């Protein structure tokens, strides 16, 4: 296995590059709709494409190419990437939906009862739709193959 350029580990380098590409796309995606680049998105979760998906899929792709699909590293990567992908579309997405509902509920109670502002601005942009995860996987696969 050849050493990587960034961390001295080719597999880790590819995963970091895939994550960066996904996040970098999110910064400039608003420009396709005539809006300004949103640099805050570089460090936020959620959105298109899933950087979690691109990271773990590029990792597993690199392991498959460099170590083989019968390697222990590939097996470990597959198990953990499955957990990450499930978490992104299932648990984290549901948590984001719960946050939306709670934020609406708190605003409703504040208006109805005339209460002071309740600190409840729960983060709503957490998980991913299946389509966002799909495109993250495509980006991860392409990155893993491109940087083999």
Task: Please tell me what each predicted stretch does.
Residues 1-24, 32-35:
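Helix-loop-helix hairpins and the membrane-proximal interhelical loops
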Residues 20-25, 38-148:
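Membrane-embedded catalytic cores of phosphoryl/pyrophosphoryl-handling enzymes
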């Amino acid at each position: 296995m050849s050493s990587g350029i960034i961390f001295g580990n080719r597999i880790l380098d590819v995963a970091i590059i895939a994550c960066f590409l996904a996040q970098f796309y999110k910064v400039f995606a608003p420009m396709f709709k005539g809006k300004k680049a949103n640099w805050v998105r570089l460090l936020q979760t959620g959105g298109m494409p899933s950087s979690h998906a691109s990271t773990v899929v590029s990792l597993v792709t690199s392991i498959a190419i460099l170590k083989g699909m019968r390697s222990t590293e590939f097996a470990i990567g597959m198990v953990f990437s499955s957990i990450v992908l499930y978490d992104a579309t299932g648990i984290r997405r549901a948590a984001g939906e719960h946050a939306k509902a709670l934020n609406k509920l708190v605003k409703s109670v504040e208006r109805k009862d005339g209460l002071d502002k309740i600190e409840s601005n729960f983060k709503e942009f957490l998980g991913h739709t299946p389509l966002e995860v799909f495109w993250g996987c495509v980006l991860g696969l392409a990155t893993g193959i491109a940087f083999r």
